[in-house]
Amino acid sequence: MDGCGTYLDTMRREAPLVQCITNFVAMNVVANVLLAAGASPAMVHDAEESGEFAAIAQALTINMGTPSPRWVEGMEAAARGATAAGRPWVLDPVAVGATAFRRGLGARLLALKPTVIRGNASEILALAGAETRGKGADSADPVAAAEAAAQRLAESSGAVVAVTGPVDFVTDGRRGIRCANGHPLMPRVTALGCSLTGIVGAFAAIRPPFEATAAALAFFGLAGEEAAKTATGPGSFQVAFLDALHALSPEALDRGARLEAA
């Protein structure tokens, strides 16, 4: 896929407002990642306003990391509000296969028609109803093992599905693309997966979801590669990663994106 830099340039010029219903662990990191990339985060999650706010925002992201009954009400209200207003929304089904509570929540959110679903291989397998070896929020399954399930899930839900790992896979049920950008230090920092969901939301706000998701993955992964050039470990990597998101130019993204048709 060509032209990732154009997607980045448009996202930065429009600075979309992204409503993020994410978890306690990730909230600060996600907000800083979106700001560094050029978007505008809003951490609005309470059911009293989440649905109304979803109609104002340009995109919504819902992360299942630390659900509670009240937060679930906010998630469902926001998803309904985004869908009614024609806003794209991204589902991050964190540890969806771990408990009956999470499986039920994942099924209800899936029924509310997300635009994009982004998860690791075990999460996508579980959401698709397939066997998985996941352990909590971590994946014990390789991306390749979830590609067929991702295609089925995309076909049945109408969503673009992104399976993220060392080499990411994105599908809309008809087309597929792989992204090889990224660095081994990225999984050593908490909330980067949650932050990637936020970036996918920012790109989906201004581009068709399949292309937007692929461009977002390339941008995020390439920023990780750039950050690793100066980092000495996970601590310094966090700071360097924010700087790389801010500094990465559309031209550099065009040169460095490693995307190929699947």
Curated annotation (Swiss-Prot):
Substrate binds at M43, A191. Keywords: ATP-binding, Kinase, Magnesium, Metal-binding, Nucleotide-binding, Thiamine biosynthesis, Transferase. It catalyses: 5-(2-hydroxyethyl)-4-methylthiazole + ATP = 4-methyl-5-(2-phosphooxyethyl)-thiazole + ADP + H(+). Its cofactor is Mg(2+). HAMAP family: Thz_kinase (MF_00228). GO terms for biological process: thiamine biosynthetic process; thiamine diphosphate biosynthetic process. Pathway: Cofactor biosynthesis; thiamine diphosphate biosynthesis; 4-methyl-5-(2-phosphoethyl)-thiazole from 5-(2-hydroxyethyl)-4-methylthiazole: step 1/1. This is Hydroxyethylthiazole kinase. The lineage of its organism: Bacteria, Pseudomonadati, Pseudomonadota, Alphaproteobacteria, Rhodobacterales. GO terms for molecular function: ATP binding; hydroxyethylthiazole kinase activity; magnesium ion binding. Belongs to the Thz kinase family. It is an enzyme of class 2 (transferase). The gene is thiM. InterPro entries: Hyethyz_kinase, Ribokinase-like. Catalyzes the phosphorylation of the hydroxyl group of 4-methyl-5-beta-hydroxyethylthiazole (THZ). Its EC number is 2.7.1.50. ATP binds at R118, T164. Disulfide bonds: none annotated. The keyword Magnesium applies. It comes from the Bacteria.
